[in-house]
Structure formats: structure tokens, C-alpha cells
Amino acid sequence: MILAVAALAAMLSACHTSGKVDNFTINVDAVSSATTAVDVPYKVANGYFVRNDVKKLPNGKISKQKDFEASFGMAAVMGNDGRPTEIDFNNQYVIAVSKPVTDRLTELEPVSLKGDGDGGLVFVYRTKAGQQLSYSMQPSLVVVVDKKYRGMVSIREEK
């Protein structure tokens, strides 16, 4: 019995000092960064546009329907997917990104939404600029997030 306890103690202390267990190496930095950068689910809201009477571009977290409606209007179109995405502000909030009016075809695409490890969220998007248009457009992106994912939201553009 004493021999079994001594062998177990030797195995445990060897695990802690070498960082290896049965030929598997544990990289503590990789484990820490993986747990702090947790993917947060979201969905892109379709069928919304930045209202033309908005003075300040809406960028960031919007938790209340009245604040959302002050900046965005609905744009229903024909077809099965023509209705704007439903947003339940009792259980969800949105992250909005918008750019100044342009005469270039411009798409804002979500890249990721992750926890930052300090109780906040980081939303990353990219801008795809295309051909010159004969009219102006206001690029915007709205994503819907469950309210169980709380915290300050930082927005970053992928270059």
C-alpha cells in the first residue's frame, strides 16, 4: 500500500514538473488564450438600413428597440426572404457597424465575435469595396446577439 501511494505521488509530481503526460505536452498559454477567446454566436440581421435623418453613424451595441429604430429603418423586399430579420430586444441586442455614404459598392462582412477574457466582447468585421456606382449608398451591418453574452463591445475592422 505504501509503495502504491509512493508511486502515485511520484507520477503526479512528475506531471507537474515536466508538463508531459503520456507523450502529450500541455501548452498553458495556448489553453489560456483558447478559453479567453470563446466564440460567441450571432446572426446577421437582413432588411435594415441607416435612416437618412441620422446625424451620428450608429456603431456599437444597441440594447433597446427605440434606440435601434431611431437609427435604422426596415426595408422589406419581394420574395420568401424579403422580411427583415426579427429582433427580440427583450432577449437580444444588436451590434451595429456603419460607414459614411459612398458611391462605391461596399459590403461590411462579419468575421468573428469573441469574448475578450475580461468580460467584454470583440466584434471583428471586414469591408469589401467594389465598383463605382451611379448612386450613393450607406454601408451598414447589423448582427443579433443573445443577451446572455454581456459586456462592453469593442469593434475592430480587419485590414
Question: What kind of feature is each model-predicted range?
Answer:
Residues 1-13:
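Sec-dependent bacterial lipoprotein signal peptides
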Residues 15-159:
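Exposed, flexible binding/inhibitory loops of compact, secreted disulfide-stabilized domains
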